[in-house]
Design a protein with these regions (language model features):
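N-terminal nicking endonuclease/strand-transfer module with a His-rich metal-binding environment
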Residues: 1-317
Length: 317
């Protein structure tokens, strides 16, 4: 069951226990796990800089061999142990560069995160289990828990080339599989966790790149300012057009609702009335499909209305 996209749940006669559990977590809005690729060094120097960032002074890095290391010298030891200089030399070979492609990544920098309030120790244990199950005896890795922000998160550095000489290629399906695995590892620690696609949950607001997101948090995003100014100008001119991608988003939402309706009917046919009702409320509560431009237009409209109200209430002189 895909809970909204590309599946044939409505043609099944009975849902499996694991599928029912996933549906239940989704409609009851269990915390969603987050896995993102934050980059990856193309040189041993870049990898060392990243280790310096995630290790800092107060954080302890844990290797795939169970070592706990701190300090620059220890981090350099990990890089030497992983033979990254050899990998870097190979990626710069004339045969590799003949196609004009950039040097390949020596490592993948991965972030495993959970919302504020999640026990940090549980996130660390789940991250250890995830890394062990996905990479042990294949790809060298190291991880470190960060608790300097409200949401506990683990930085996981994975060597791109395996011990068997196979390169780790991370695709969209890889990330979906990893999210499900990480959520399972968290639940094994007694932590409520779910891994469902954004569209299936009715989430349509576009995700921001790491750089834009950090700039937004710091209040210095030129991208967001330029987008807001563009929407404001279009609204003033009276020619705010519908974005080309919105029709695809609307089509996706229709497909999501169609499959959720099939699941709802299947639950009722199997006597799962309470869960079917929860599915119905979940779908009814999905926010309207909204592009980034829609979001800006609504925010600007609300702000204009607030300003006018404040002016009307201001005492006259």
């Amino acid at each position: 069951v895909t809970y909204g996209r590309g599946g044939s749940s409505e043609r099944q006669l009975r849902l499996l226990p694991g599928e029912i559990a996933h549906i239940t977590r989704t409609v009851r809005r269990a915390p969603e796990v987050m896995i993102k690729i934050s980059g990856g060094g193309q040189s041993a120097k870049a990898v060392a800089a990243h280790f310096g960032y995630i290790g800092r002074q107060e954080f302890e890095i844990e290797t795939d061999h169970g070592q706990h290391i701190t300090g620059t010298d220890a981090q350099r030891g990990v890089i030497a142990d992983w033979d990254l200089d050899l990998d870097a030399a190979e990626s710069r070979s004339p045969y590799r560069g003949a196609s004009g492609r950039k040097p390949t990544k020596l490592v993948h920098n991965i972030v495993l995160s959970m919302p504020k309030g999640t026990p940090a120790v549980g996130v660390l244990e789940a991250s250890r289990a995830f890394a062990r199950e996905e990479f042990a005896f294949q790809h060298r890795y190291a991880l470190v828990l960060h608790t300097d922000q409200p949401h506990p998160h683990v930085h996981l550095v994975v060597k791109a080339m395996s011990e068997q000489g196979r390169r780790l290629n991370i695709r969209k399906q890889t990330l979906r599989d990893w999210r499900r695995k990480f959520a399972s590892c968290l639940r094994a620690q007694g932590i409520a966790a779910n891994a469902t696609e954004r569209a299936v949950r009715g989430v349509t607001n576009p995700q921001k790149s790491n750089g834009i997101y950090r700039a937004m948090r710091a209040g210095r995003s030129t991208h967001m300012r330029e987008r807001a100014e563009s929407v404001a100008a279009a609204m003033q001119a009276g020619n705010l057009r519908v974005e080309a991608g919105k029709s695809r988003m609307v089509d996706t939402r229709r497909e999501v609702i169609r499959h959720w309706s099939g699941i709802q009917q299947l639950l009722r046919s199997n006597g799962q009335e309470q869960l079917a009702n929860e599915v119905e409320r979940f779908v009814a509560g999905m926010p309207a499909v909204q592009t980034e431009r829609d979001w800006f237009a609504l925010a600007l409209t609300d702000r204009t209305r607030d300003v006018r109200r404040e002016r009307s209430l201001a005492p006259t002189r």
